[in-house]
Amino acid sequence: MSIILGIETSCDETGVGIVSGSTVLANEVASSSLRHKPFGGVIPEIAARAHLEYLPNLLELALETAQLCIKDIDGIAVTAGPGLVTSLSVGVSAAKALGLSTGTPVYGVNHLVGHAVSAFLDDYTNDGLGVIHRRDSIGSNGIENDASSTHSHTHTTQVNRHSNLCVYTPPRRVLRDVCKYMHVRDSVVLLASGGHSCLLKIHNNKISLLGETLDDAAGEAFDKIARLMGLQYPGGPAIEMLASSGNPNAVEFPRALLTHFEEHNRYSFSFSGLKTAVGRVVERIKSNPAHSIPKIEDIAASFQEAVADVLTAKTVAAALASDVDLIVMGGGVAANNRIREMLCERAKIHGLDVKIPPIALCTDNGAMIAAAGSWLMQLGYNPSHSRFSPVSIMPLTQMVV
Protein backbone atom coordinates (compact mmCIF):
# COMPACT_ATOMS: atom_id res chain seq x y z
CA MET A 1 0.00 0.00 0.00
CA SER A 2 1.45 3.38 -1.02
CA ILE A 3 2.24 5.96 1.64
CA ILE A 4 1.26 9.50 0.64
CA LEU A 5 2.40 12.78 2.15
CA GLY A 6 -0.12 15.64 1.88
CA ILE A 7 0.65 19.36 2.12
CA GLU A 8 -2.10 21.97 2.56
CA THR A 9 -1.46 25.75 2.42
CA SER A 10 -4.46 27.15 0.55
CA CYS A 11 -5.43 29.81 3.10
CA ASP A 12 -4.40 30.44 6.71
CA GLU A 13 -3.92 26.88 7.93
CA THR A 14 -0.75 24.90 7.34
CA GLY A 15 -1.24 21.15 7.21
CA VAL A 16 1.01 18.14 6.73
CA GLY A 17 -0.61 14.72 6.74
CA ILE A 18 0.43 11.17 5.91
CA VAL A 19 -1.97 8.43 4.85
CA SER A 20 -1.67 4.89 3.58
CA GLY A 21 -4.79 4.01 1.62
CA SER A 22 -7.61 5.18 3.87
CA THR A 23 -5.56 5.04 7.06
CA VAL A 24 -4.33 8.27 8.63
CA LEU A 25 -0.79 7.86 9.92
CA ALA A 26 -0.23 11.49 10.90
CA ASN A 27 -1.91 14.86 10.59
CA GLU A 28 -0.25 18.01 11.86
CA VAL A 29 -2.07 21.33 11.54
CA ALA A 30 -1.05 24.86 12.52
CA SER A 31 -3.20 27.95 12.06
CA SER A 32 -2.22 31.60 11.85
CA SER A 33 -5.76 32.70 12.78
CA LEU A 34 -4.58 34.61 15.86
CA ARG A 35 -2.37 36.74 13.63
CA HIS A 36 -5.35 37.65 11.43
CA LYS A 37 -7.79 38.29 14.29
CA PRO A 38 -6.95 42.02 14.65
CA PHE A 39 -7.84 42.51 10.97
CA GLY A 40 -11.13 40.57 11.04
CA GLY A 41 -10.07 38.34 8.16
CA VAL A 42 -7.17 36.62 6.44
CA ILE A 43 -4.31 38.82 5.23
CA PRO A 44 -2.60 36.91 2.36
CA GLU A 45 0.94 38.11 3.07
CA ILE A 46 0.68 37.23 6.78
CA ALA A 47 -0.71 33.80 5.90
CA ALA A 48 2.09 33.09 3.42
CA ARG A 49 4.79 34.07 5.92
CA ALA A 50 3.20 31.82 8.53
CA HIS A 51 3.25 28.88 6.11
CA LEU A 52 6.97 29.44 5.56
CA GLU A 53 7.51 29.41 9.31
CA TYR A 54 5.31 26.40 10.15
CA LEU A 55 5.88 24.00 7.28
CA PRO A 56 9.38 22.64 8.10
CA ASN A 57 8.42 21.85 11.70
CA LEU A 58 5.11 20.26 10.72
CA LEU A 59 6.83 18.05 8.15
CA GLU A 60 9.28 16.88 10.80
CA LEU A 61 6.46 16.24 13.27
CA ALA A 62 4.30 14.34 10.78
CA LEU A 63 7.14 11.97 9.89
CA GLU A 64 7.92 11.45 13.56
CA THR A 65 4.27 10.78 14.40
CA ALA A 66 4.00 8.24 11.57
CA GLN A 67 7.37 6.77 12.58
CA LEU A 68 8.61 7.15 9.01
CA CYS A 69 11.43 8.89 7.20
CA ILE A 70 11.11 10.81 3.95
CA LYS A 71 12.43 7.88 1.89
CA ASP A 72 9.36 5.85 2.97
CA ILE A 73 7.04 8.25 1.14
CA ASP A 74 5.74 6.92 -2.20
CA GLY A 75 3.94 10.05 -3.37
CA ILE A 76 3.49 13.71 -2.44
CA ALA A 77 0.13 15.44 -2.82
CA VAL A 78 -0.10 19.21 -2.47
CA THR A 79 -2.96 21.66 -2.82
CA ALA A 80 -2.51 23.40 -6.18
CA GLY A 81 -5.79 25.35 -6.01
CA PRO A 82 -8.17 26.93 -5.47
CA GLY A 83 -6.98 29.31 -2.79
CA LEU A 84 -4.72 32.27 -2.12
CA VAL A 85 -1.90 32.08 -4.64
CA THR A 86 0.69 33.46 -2.22
CA SER A 87 -0.23 30.75 0.30
CA LEU A 88 -0.49 27.99 -2.29
CA SER A 89 2.96 28.86 -3.64
CA VAL A 90 4.59 27.99 -0.32
CA GLY A 91 3.16 24.48 -0.26
CA VAL A 92 3.74 23.84 -3.96
CA SER A 93 7.36 24.98 -3.74
CA ALA A 94 7.96 22.73 -0.74
CA ALA A 95 6.35 19.73 -2.46
CA LYS A 96 8.40 20.26 -5.61
CA ALA A 97 11.62 20.55 -3.61
CA LEU A 98 10.87 17.35 -1.71
CA GLY A 99 9.90 15.54 -4.89
CA LEU A 100 13.00 16.65 -6.76
CA SER A 101 15.39 15.81 -3.93
CA THR A 102 13.92 12.36 -3.26
CA GLY A 103 12.69 11.34 -6.71
CA THR A 104 9.14 11.08 -5.38
CA PRO A 105 6.20 11.84 -7.74
CA VAL A 106 4.24 15.00 -6.92
CA TYR A 107 0.49 15.44 -7.45
CA GLY A 108 -0.93 18.97 -7.48
CA VAL A 109 -4.49 18.25 -6.36
CA ASN A 110 -7.73 20.18 -6.16
CA HIS A 111 -8.43 21.42 -2.63
CA LEU A 112 -12.15 20.63 -2.96
CA VAL A 113 -11.42 17.02 -3.89
CA GLY A 114 -9.57 16.73 -0.59
CA HIS A 115 -12.63 17.92 1.32
CA ALA A 116 -14.88 15.59 -0.68
CA VAL A 117 -12.92 12.42 0.08
CA SER A 118 -11.89 13.19 3.67
CA ALA A 119 -15.07 11.55 4.98
CA PHE A 120 -13.89 8.23 3.53
CA LEU A 121 -10.79 8.09 5.70
CA ASP A 122 -10.87 5.55 8.52
CA ASP A 123 -12.09 6.62 11.95
CA TYR A 124 -8.60 7.16 13.26
CA THR A 125 -9.84 8.91 16.42
CA ASN A 126 -11.02 5.63 17.91
CA ASP A 127 -8.67 2.95 16.62
CA GLY A 128 -5.33 4.45 17.60
CA LEU A 129 -4.07 4.55 14.01
CA GLY A 130 -3.70 8.27 13.64
CA VAL A 131 -3.97 11.70 15.15
CA ILE A 132 -5.06 15.24 14.56
CA HIS A 133 -2.72 17.50 16.48
CA ARG A 134 -3.95 21.00 15.93
CA ARG A 135 -2.02 24.11 16.87
CA ASP A 136 -4.19 27.19 16.50
CA SER A 137 -1.13 29.38 16.31
CA ILE A 138 2.59 28.84 16.63
CA GLY A 139 4.75 31.78 17.55
CA SER A 140 8.42 32.07 16.81
CA ASN A 141 9.13 31.09 20.40
CA GLY A 142 6.65 28.23 20.68
CA ILE A 143 2.98 27.48 20.84
CA GLU A 144 0.55 30.34 21.41
CA ASN A 145 -2.50 28.12 21.65
CA ASP A 146 -2.72 24.32 21.45
CA ALA A 147 -6.12 22.87 20.55
CA SER A 148 -5.31 19.22 20.03
CA SER A 149 -8.19 16.84 19.52
CA THR A 150 -9.09 14.47 22.32
CA HIS A 151 -8.62 10.72 22.01
CA SER A 152 -9.97 7.67 23.75
CA HIS A 153 -6.44 6.32 24.13
CA THR A 154 -3.75 7.58 26.48
CA HIS A 155 -0.52 8.54 24.74
CA THR A 156 2.52 10.55 25.70
CA THR A 157 3.31 14.12 24.73
CA GLN A 158 6.85 15.42 24.72
CA VAL A 159 8.59 18.66 23.83
CA ASN A 160 10.85 18.82 20.81
CA ARG A 161 13.53 21.28 21.89
CA HIS A 162 14.69 21.93 18.36
CA SER A 163 11.30 23.11 17.07
CA ASN A 164 9.87 24.05 20.47
CA LEU A 165 6.61 22.29 19.59
CA CYS A 166 4.59 19.60 21.30
CA VAL A 167 5.03 16.23 19.62
CA TYR A 168 2.38 13.51 19.80
CA THR A 169 3.89 10.04 20.23
CA PRO A 170 1.43 7.35 19.07
CA PRO A 171 1.54 3.59 19.55
CA ARG A 172 3.65 1.63 17.07
CA ARG A 173 2.30 1.93 13.54
CA VAL A 174 0.67 -0.89 11.67
CA LEU A 175 2.50 -2.11 8.57
CA ARG A 176 1.48 -0.58 5.27
CA ASP A 177 0.27 -3.91 3.85
CA VAL A 178 -2.61 -4.10 6.34
CA CYS A 179 -3.96 -0.64 5.50
CA LYS A 180 -7.12 -0.46 3.40
CA TYR A 181 -7.60 1.12 -0.01
CA MET A 182 -9.52 4.38 -0.31
CA HIS A 183 -13.09 3.38 -1.13
CA VAL A 184 -15.01 6.45 -2.28
CA ARG A 185 -18.73 5.69 -2.60
CA ASP A 186 -21.22 7.31 -4.95
CA SER A 187 -22.69 10.21 -3.02
CA VAL A 188 -23.81 13.82 -2.95
CA VAL A 189 -21.27 16.04 -1.20
CA LEU A 190 -22.01 19.33 0.56
CA LEU A 191 -18.88 21.46 0.84
CA ALA A 192 -19.31 24.56 2.97
CA SER A 193 -16.42 26.73 4.10
CA GLY A 194 -15.22 30.31 4.18
CA GLY A 195 -14.32 30.21 0.52
CA HIS A 196 -16.69 27.65 -0.95
CA SER A 197 -20.30 26.53 -0.76
CA CYS A 198 -21.23 23.93 -3.34
CA LEU A 199 -22.98 20.63 -3.96
CA LEU A 200 -21.02 17.90 -5.72
CA LYS A 201 -21.89 14.48 -7.03
CA ILE A 202 -19.48 11.55 -6.89
CA HIS A 203 -20.37 8.84 -9.39
CA ASN A 204 -18.09 6.09 -10.67
CA ASN A 205 -15.05 7.83 -9.17
CA LYS A 206 -15.81 11.07 -11.00
CA ILE A 207 -16.79 14.35 -9.34
CA SER A 208 -19.25 16.77 -10.94
CA LEU A 209 -20.66 20.10 -9.79
CA LEU A 210 -24.41 20.26 -9.07
CA GLY A 211 -24.54 23.83 -7.79
CA GLU A 212 -22.56 26.50 -5.96
CA THR A 213 -23.00 29.84 -4.26
CA LEU A 214 -23.92 32.76 -6.49
CA ASP A 215 -22.35 35.27 -4.08
CA ASP A 216 -21.07 34.76 -0.53
CA ALA A 217 -19.95 31.38 0.75
CA ALA A 218 -21.63 30.15 3.93
CA GLY A 219 -18.49 30.52 6.02
CA GLU A 220 -17.91 33.98 4.60
CA ALA A 221 -21.44 34.95 5.69
CA PHE A 222 -20.70 33.70 9.22
CA ASP A 223 -17.53 35.81 9.35
CA LYS A 224 -19.24 38.96 8.05
CA ILE A 225 -22.21 38.66 10.40
CA ALA A 226 -19.86 38.04 13.32
CA ARG A 227 -18.00 41.23 12.42
CA LEU A 228 -21.28 43.18 12.38
CA MET A 229 -22.09 41.80 15.82
CA GLY A 230 -18.69 42.76 17.16
CA LEU A 231 -17.62 39.13 17.59
CA GLN A 232 -14.11 37.81 17.10
CA TYR A 233 -12.70 36.21 13.96
CA PRO A 234 -13.27 33.46 12.91
CA GLY A 235 -16.99 34.08 13.02
CA GLY A 236 -18.36 30.54 12.77
CA PRO A 237 -17.45 29.32 16.27
CA ALA A 238 -18.30 32.72 17.79
CA ILE A 239 -21.81 32.76 16.31
CA GLU A 240 -22.44 29.12 17.19
CA MET A 241 -21.52 29.79 20.82
CA LEU A 242 -23.79 32.85 20.95
CA ALA A 243 -26.61 30.98 19.21
CA SER A 244 -26.54 28.21 21.81
CA SER A 245 -28.41 30.49 24.23
CA GLY A 246 -30.72 32.04 21.64
CA ASN A 247 -34.09 31.28 20.05
CA PRO A 248 -33.68 30.06 16.45
CA ASN A 249 -37.27 31.07 15.66
CA ALA A 250 -37.08 34.61 17.03
CA VAL A 251 -36.44 36.26 13.66
CA GLU A 252 -37.69 34.99 10.32
CA PHE A 253 -34.72 35.58 8.06
CA PRO A 254 -34.94 34.93 4.29
CA ARG A 255 -34.02 31.56 2.76
CA ALA A 256 -32.86 32.53 -0.73
CA LEU A 257 -33.44 30.13 -3.65
CA LEU A 258 -35.14 27.62 -1.35
CA THR A 259 -38.76 27.77 -2.53
CA HIS A 260 -38.76 29.91 -5.67
CA PHE A 261 -35.90 29.40 -8.06
CA GLU A 262 -35.09 28.84 -11.71
CA GLU A 263 -34.29 25.28 -12.73
CA HIS A 264 -30.60 26.00 -13.30
CA ASN A 265 -30.33 27.38 -9.75
CA ARG A 266 -32.03 24.41 -8.12
CA TYR A 267 -28.87 23.44 -6.24
CA SER A 268 -27.28 26.89 -6.03
CA PHE A 269 -26.91 28.98 -2.89
CA SER A 270 -27.15 32.70 -2.13
CA PHE A 271 -26.33 34.23 1.24
CA SER A 272 -25.93 37.93 0.38
CA GLY A 273 -29.62 38.69 0.99
CA LEU A 274 -29.54 36.88 4.33
CA LYS A 275 -26.41 38.81 5.29
CA THR A 276 -28.12 42.10 4.45
CA ALA A 277 -31.26 41.20 6.41
CA VAL A 278 -29.26 40.26 9.51
CA GLY A 279 -27.19 43.42 9.17
CA ARG A 280 -30.30 45.60 9.20
CA VAL A 281 -31.56 44.00 12.41
CA VAL A 282 -28.15 44.37 14.08
CA GLU A 283 -27.88 48.02 13.05
CA ARG A 284 -31.39 48.71 14.37
CA ILE A 285 -30.39 47.35 17.76
CA LYS A 286 -27.13 49.31 17.77
CA SER A 287 -29.00 52.55 17.04
CA ASN A 288 -31.44 51.94 19.89
CA PRO A 289 -29.73 49.74 22.51
CA ALA A 290 -32.40 50.49 25.12
CA HIS A 291 -34.87 48.45 23.06
CA SER A 292 -32.62 45.57 22.03
CA ILE A 293 -35.34 43.20 20.87
CA PRO A 294 -34.63 40.65 19.53
CA LYS A 295 -31.63 39.85 21.68
CA ILE A 296 -28.29 39.43 19.97
CA GLU A 297 -28.33 35.72 20.94
CA ASP A 298 -31.66 35.30 19.14
CA ILE A 299 -30.29 36.97 16.02
CA ALA A 300 -27.30 34.62 16.00
CA ALA A 301 -29.51 31.57 16.48
CA SER A 302 -31.99 32.67 13.80
CA PHE A 303 -29.19 33.39 11.32
CA GLN A 304 -27.58 30.02 11.99
CA GLU A 305 -30.95 28.30 11.57
CA ALA A 306 -31.51 29.98 8.20
CA VAL A 307 -28.10 28.87 6.91
CA ALA A 308 -28.67 25.33 8.18
CA ASP A 309 -32.12 25.20 6.61
CA VAL A 310 -30.90 26.19 3.15
CA LEU A 311 -27.78 24.00 3.14
CA THR A 312 -29.50 20.86 4.38
CA ALA A 313 -32.73 21.17 2.39
CA LYS A 314 -30.89 21.54 -0.91
CA THR A 315 -28.45 18.75 -0.06
CA VAL A 316 -31.19 16.24 0.72
CA ALA A 317 -33.11 17.27 -2.41
CA ALA A 318 -29.97 16.78 -4.52
CA ALA A 319 -29.35 13.33 -3.04
CA LEU A 320 -32.92 12.21 -3.73
CA ALA A 321 -32.78 13.52 -7.30
CA SER A 322 -29.37 11.91 -7.90
CA ASP A 323 -30.55 8.47 -6.76
CA VAL A 324 -27.77 8.01 -4.21
CA ASP A 325 -28.16 6.79 -0.65
CA LEU A 326 -25.23 8.66 0.88
CA ILE A 327 -24.65 12.30 1.78
CA VAL A 328 -21.16 13.55 2.64
CA MET A 329 -20.43 16.89 4.26
CA GLY A 330 -17.07 18.64 4.46
CA GLY A 331 -15.47 22.03 4.91
CA GLY A 332 -15.09 24.26 7.94
CA VAL A 333 -18.82 24.99 8.22
CA ALA A 334 -19.37 21.24 8.69
CA ALA A 335 -17.97 21.75 12.19
CA ASN A 336 -21.19 23.59 13.10
CA ASN A 337 -23.18 21.26 15.33
CA ARG A 338 -26.61 22.63 14.38
CA ILE A 339 -25.96 22.11 10.67
CA ARG A 340 -24.67 18.58 11.28
CA GLU A 341 -27.70 17.80 13.45
CA MET A 342 -30.24 19.14 10.95
CA LEU A 343 -28.62 17.32 8.03
CA CYS A 344 -28.72 14.00 9.88
CA GLU A 345 -32.34 14.54 10.93
CA ARG A 346 -33.52 15.33 7.40
CA ALA A 347 -31.50 12.56 5.80
CA LYS A 348 -32.90 9.99 8.23
CA ILE A 349 -36.46 10.87 7.22
CA HIS A 350 -35.65 9.82 3.65
CA GLY A 351 -33.53 6.79 4.55
CA LEU A 352 -30.26 8.43 3.52
CA ASP A 353 -26.92 7.75 5.18
CA VAL A 354 -24.68 10.64 6.22
CA LYS A 355 -20.89 10.67 6.52
CA ILE A 356 -19.29 13.69 8.16
CA PRO A 357 -15.58 13.69 9.02
CA PRO A 358 -14.47 14.30 12.61
CA ILE A 359 -14.59 18.03 13.30
CA ALA A 360 -10.79 18.26 13.14
CA LEU A 361 -10.89 16.91 9.57
CA CYS A 362 -13.58 19.36 8.43
CA THR A 363 -11.22 22.31 8.47
CA ASP A 364 -8.24 22.49 6.12
CA ASN A 365 -5.60 19.85 6.86
CA GLY A 366 -2.89 17.79 5.21
CA ALA A 367 -4.53 14.40 5.67
CA MET A 368 -7.39 15.27 3.33
CA ILE A 369 -4.90 16.30 0.64
CA ALA A 370 -2.95 13.09 1.17
CA ALA A 371 -6.26 11.21 0.91
CA ALA A 372 -7.00 12.92 -2.41
CA GLY A 373 -3.54 11.93 -3.64
CA SER A 374 -4.02 8.36 -2.45
CA TRP A 375 -7.37 8.11 -4.25
CA LEU A 376 -6.05 9.62 -7.49
CA MET A 377 -3.05 7.29 -7.47
CA GLN A 378 -5.39 4.32 -7.03
CA LEU A 379 -7.37 5.53 -10.05
CA GLY A 380 -4.21 5.67 -12.16
CA TYR A 381 -3.76 9.43 -12.51
CA ASN A 382 -0.32 10.54 -13.63
CA PRO A 383 1.82 12.83 -11.46
CA SER A 384 1.80 16.54 -12.21
CA HIS A 385 4.33 18.10 -14.55
CA SER A 386 7.33 19.52 -12.69
CA ARG A 387 6.50 23.02 -13.94
CA PHE A 388 2.92 23.19 -12.68
CA SER A 389 1.89 26.38 -10.90
CA PRO A 390 -0.69 27.07 -8.17
CA VAL A 391 -3.94 28.70 -9.29
CA SER A 392 -6.53 30.73 -7.39
CA ILE A 393 -9.41 29.21 -9.37
CA MET A 394 -9.48 25.50 -10.20
CA PRO A 395 -12.56 23.80 -11.67
CA LEU A 396 -13.68 20.51 -10.16
CA THR A 397 -13.28 18.85 -13.53
CA GLN A 398 -9.55 19.30 -12.93
CA MET A 399 -8.90 16.99 -9.97
CA VAL A 400 -5.13 17.09 -10.48
CA VAL A 401 -2.91 19.48 -12.46
Curated annotation (Swiss-Prot):
InterPro entries (alphabetical): ATPase_NBD, Gcp-like_dom, KAE1/TsaD, TsaD
Cofactor: Fe(2+)
UniProt remark on cofactor binding: Binds 1 Fe(2+) ion per subunit.
Catalytic activity annotation: L-threonylcarbamoyladenylate + adenosine(37) in tRNA = N(6)-L-threonylcarbamoyladenosine(37) in tRNA + AMP + H(+)
Record-listed Fe cation binding positions: H111, H115, D364
Gene Ontology CC terms, in alphabetical order: cytoplasm
Entry EC no(s): 2.3.1.234
Primary subcellular site in the record, as a coarse category: cytoplasm
Any one Pfam family match given in the protein's UniProt record, by short name: TsaD
Keywords carried by this UniProt record: Acyltransferase, Cytoplasm, Iron, Metal-binding, Transferase, tRNA processing
Positions contributing to substrate binding: L191, A192, S193, G194, G195, D223, G236, N336
Annotated GO MF terms: iron ion binding; N(6)-L-threonylcarbamoyladenine synthase activity
GO aspect biological process, one term: tRNA threonylcarbamoyladenosine modification
SUPFAM superfamilies: Actin-like ATPase domain
Compartment(s): Cytoplasm
Keyword Lipoprotein found: no
Family to which the UniProt record says this protein belongs: Belongs to the KAE1 / TsaD family.
Function: Required for the formation of a threonylcarbamoyl group on adenosine at position 37 (t(6)A37) in tRNAs that read codons beginning with adenine. Is involved in the transfer of the threonylcarbamoyl moiety of threonylcarbamoyl-AMP (TC-AMP) to the N6 group of A37, together with TsaE and TsaB. TsaD likely plays a direct catalytic role in this reaction.
Entry protein name: tRNA N6-adenosine threonylcarbamoyltransferase
Native source species: Tropheryma whipplei (strain Twist) (Whipple's bacillus)
Gene: tsaD
